[in-house]
Amino acid sequence: MENNNYNNHVSGENSGGQRGHFFYGGNQVLGGAAPIYGRGGDCYDPMIVKTEGGGSTSHHNHTFHYPSIIRNHHHDSTETSGGGAGAGEVIEALKAKIIAHPQCSNLLDAYMDCQKVGAPPEVAARLSAVRQEFEARQRRSLTDRDVSKDPELDQFMEAYYDMLVKYREELTRPLQEAMEFMQKIEAQLNMLGNAPVRIFNSEDKCEGVGSSEEDQDNSGGETELPEIDPRAEDRELKNHLLRKYSGYLSSLKQELSKKKKKGKLPKDARQKLITWWELHYKWPYPSESEKVALAESTGLDQKQINNWFINQRKRHWKPSEDMQFMVMDGLHPQSAAALYMEGHYMGEGPFRLGQ
């Protein structure tokens, strides 16, 4: 039978691997007292689809309500031959209906996709060749057969196909995550090193992760290492650190610039203080009432006004010797300013100290 030859060939290809294997065709499925692997001795028991992989075994219990087909075939064969037909003819008829079903090709493709996950390219190519050979045999065997509609068989084929598609997704997900992790490590090594580092060939897909024997023979077991310039490594490390921490440095620079700008007074308020300074340059000591007025006009508090006048006098004003003597004699600054303005100690006319 073509189906038996196909399953024996595929099982031989996968005998040395650790990937999951499906048992849905061949002698395990349609021969003997157990039509599908994982079922009991009674062919009318609910169907159990079993998958094995790695060291773990998982059972997917799907009740397809398909034994009624077997009962119908068994009933028809009993009436035709008077009970002389065995269970083998019933199983062969059921197997023929499965092979002749339009969904059988899609079911086979889904199974082959599961087998190709993580397989080397040569193994994937052999699996594709086996699949094409089986499909050709299937077309030749279906030329003289009449395909009748069977809703229960349609339900079984669709459910089994969906299960294989989901199983392929589960097999592909960890392999894809591993490949993404290796690409990330490869990119980090390329940034730190001078020459590009290739952990695996990026052109290989999930179906061809392994390397062929020809590549290993041509390499001769030797790998040429590029010459490394220490200065190039320093430059690469510097660029890597700049790319990594440039955001932190720019944010820190902005924060420091904000702190520096925080000490500056508003432009309008500063201009009003400078105007008062120029008008009272001979004695730039505002009284408490003047400080209150300046605070109201500039919108600043008295502490800011006091600090501004202190810094302004330290940087831009120097009292005359007469004013210094008056302060040393204990005269109040305001009284000294009044005397100074009246010209008791200085001549009349405009005069700017410190000029």
UniProtKB/Swiss-Prot annotation:
Superkingdom of origin organism: Eukaryota
What does the sequence similarity comment in the record state about its family?
Belongs to the TALE/KNOX homeobox family.
Task: State the residue spans of region: Disordered.
Answer: 205-233
Q: Which organism is it from?
A: Solanum lycopersicum (Tomato)
This chain's function reads: Appears to be involved in meristem formation and in the regulation of leaf morphology. Misexpression makes the leaf more compound which is always associated with growth retardation and loss of apical dominance, resulting in dwarfed, bushy plants. Probably binds to the DNA sequence 5'-TGAC-3'.
Query: What GO CC annotations are associated with the protein?
Result: nucleus
Q: In which tissues is it expressed?
A: Expressed in the apical meristems, in the newly emerged lateral primordia in the floral bud, in their vascular bundles and in the cortex parenchyma of the floral pedicle. Also present in the lateral tips of leaf primordia.
* Main location per the UniProt record: nucleus
The ranges the UniProt entry gives for DNA binding are 257-320
Q: Which UniProt keywords apply?
A: DNA-binding, Homeobox, Nucleus
Q: Name one GO molecular function term.
A: DNA binding
Any idea where the ELK domain is? 236-256
State the protein's name.
Homeotic protein knotted-1
* Localization terms from the record: Nucleus
Annotated signal sequence range: none
